[in-house]
Amino acid sequence: MKRLYSSVAVLLLSIMVSACATQSNAPMAGKEIPKSWIDPDTGHKIVRLSEEPGSRSLYFHQNSYAASGDKMVISVDNPKGVAVIDLKTLEVKRLYDDPNIGILFMGPVSRDVYLTYIPAVDGEVVHPQNELQTPTKVLAVNIDTGAVREVATIARGKIHSINNDETLLIGAFAQEAHNLETGPRDKRFEARYEAKDAEGNPLSFADAKEVRMDERLEKRIPMQMFTVNIQNGEQKTILKSTDWLNHIQFSPHDPELVMYSHEGPWHKVDRIWLTDIHGRTPQKIHSRMMNMEIAGHEFWSFDGKEIFYDLQTPRGQDFWLASYNLETGERVWRHMERDEWSVHFNMSRDGKLFAGDGGDSEMVAKAKNGKWIYLFDSVPVKDVAGISARNAKDLIKPATLKSTKLVNMQNHDYRLEPNITFTPDGKWLVFRSNMHGPVHVYAVEIAKH
């Protein structure tokens, strides 16, 4: 495995040394988008991994990498489908085309990528959501052979995650339809949220999203969380609730442990919860201590021992990357500056490095200079002169995040979330961006030369 990861790094470096020049991350106005370049503001090398406009990497906690680390999957457009990137050669191959499919994730054990198939309605693409009241077919496609098999059909709702031994899928459905979005999506962006203030003025994208989410939360639509047996398609309900169940993630270590969220405006909900496939009493992971405190965009460490999340005390004022250790109960809060807040955070597989994808001035941090891809080191705040409080081990452990800017995202429109992920070897960050106009998938090298 180490040899494979090393070969990926060497190949990426050799391609960029031969082809890269210092260029700006600016819209190309009809010109060809460069295959590789050095960001003039950070000195880090960037590679465009995708070949086709409209290509996207997956959501930040959805696995896009084969277990062996040699390939990753992305979505492609025109025609809509799935492509595979060989991380040894950087060759991109279309794997499966269909206008009605979407990518869920790579299997953690097999060489299969899991897809959804949802028929279009009146010529419009139907996006997976918990409130969907029509069937979704789940397919598995082998990334080497292209062999396709049907896994299951769910009558309604959405599949969210797959467990680490690849025996179960998990999803949720609401008992009535509701659409957060107000019309067809612009392909350059993430979603379409529109709302007006009390005077009838259009709200910003970020504020409109809050309004639309609050409308959905207050409907208190009955929901169910369910598992799907990958071998035989059997479905089993594990949780019923009128809370808005969302962001469901199996533990990467325990095939029965499940993290999920109570969705809605973060300051109104206790968001992060644990349960299991047997429906054990849910455990709340973070308790609010002040009004307007928010926590969310939670994700697992790769060893499954910790849960990480964006914490703000209060919202939009003080920013932390927090974690909770399931084995020891230890909590760590890592402080960051306003401009370093990111839409999503992620971590390397060895747990040594963190990354963030930045944000624009309309988002919660109201950052003045936040449009960057960041690398973070966590630096603990140590006791003074080695003197500890008697109950130090029972207290939250403070730390700070030391940031390094990797990519200037000034020309990126954050209505498309970059969704950064570390490559399995920990040497690159993969993200999606519309910085040059069309959406493409890019990788930035963490090492600086």
List PLM regions with ranges.
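Short loop/turn segments that connect beta-strands within beta-propeller blades
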Residues: 86-90, 142-146, 229-233, 276-280, ...
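Beta-strand-rich domains and repeat architectures in extracellular enzymes and scaffolds
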Residues: 25-36, 45-80, 248
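Conserved beta-propeller blade repeats
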Residues: 55-73, 98-119, 155-174, 202, ...
